[in-house]
């Protein structure tokens, strides 16, 4: 199992002294020097430009793979995606990974005015178009009844590699099948349950084999952040962060299936949390995460969510507990897991100790 650093724009929203951009680069530089496997930058419609962030990180790192987790062909047309990935791959010396997903279609359709069509068909065609642009003769053509109607468009800037890996963010059965048949990996959202993973990973492998592909080299990336905590106060903070995440993300349409577990009545719980967070009303009005935070009551939502559910969905605890949780995920076939930065996140030695403790 390998570990990754997950970067989010949220740190920048709390930037009071203008140092957040430099700190982002410093943390990435330290993690890379400590031999972290990958650095991922999230991309939400209201946030930063993940390709710009990773291009800057490419200039201060040497080893780590650099991935988007995840972008969507709705706000980023496939031609723009092809250009951005090729540019990042060139700047990084062949280290780019594309994390691709449909995103929250309600935001694209209702707030940004984008025609979404059939999201799965859009994703499948996007993957096919990107492969055509990245491989000689670098000319892409959509199917006759395609979603984009690309008519022989040729690109002149290509990635270092013609097989840049594409990882699909997948939750539903059809998306898992598409990932296995056409991509190199799957990205599972933070707090995906082991119950879900036990069903999903074999399905992806079966889809790969059915498409004549070898699933042995497939990557399964879990975005759940590994948090080693040694005090009750540190655990409390980690659990509350997990509750916030559950209230804001797992209540969105299509996300609840990832967090279902036999130990809890998750559908009933999420219905209560949605009501407290006013999730449906906010989405219907075209609101994104800023509106969800304003309109919902996170304090009340946290009170509804059992601590033990977050412990079950997370990777939280003292080092021996975390190691056991990681061992379980490794046995399931998860290949990559996110890790919370050490307290001194700009220290190479702190990163090395953390990764060594976790077993990398």
Predicted regions located by residue number:
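Short, acidic/polar
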Residues: 17-31, 81-84, 170-178, 242, ...
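N-terminal beta1-alpha1-beta2 module of alpha/beta enzyme domains
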Residues: 1-66, 164
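An alpha-helical appendage that flanks or caps ligand/catalytic pockets
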Residues: 117-157, 197-202, 206-328
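Conserved, mostly hydrophobic/aromatic
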Residues: 35, 57, 88, 130, ...
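Active-site mouth loops of central-metabolism enzymes
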Residues: 4-22, 69-78, 160-171, 226-230, ...
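Short, well-ordered coil/turn segments that N-cap beta-strands
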Residues: 1-3, 36-38, 61-66, 90-97, ...
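Hydrophobic faces of well-ordered beta-strands that scaffold small-molecule active sites
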Residues: 3-9, 39-41, 66-69, 96-100, ...
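Alpha-helix-loop-beta-strand connector modules within alpha/beta enzyme cores
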Residues: 51-71, 75, 122, 126, ...
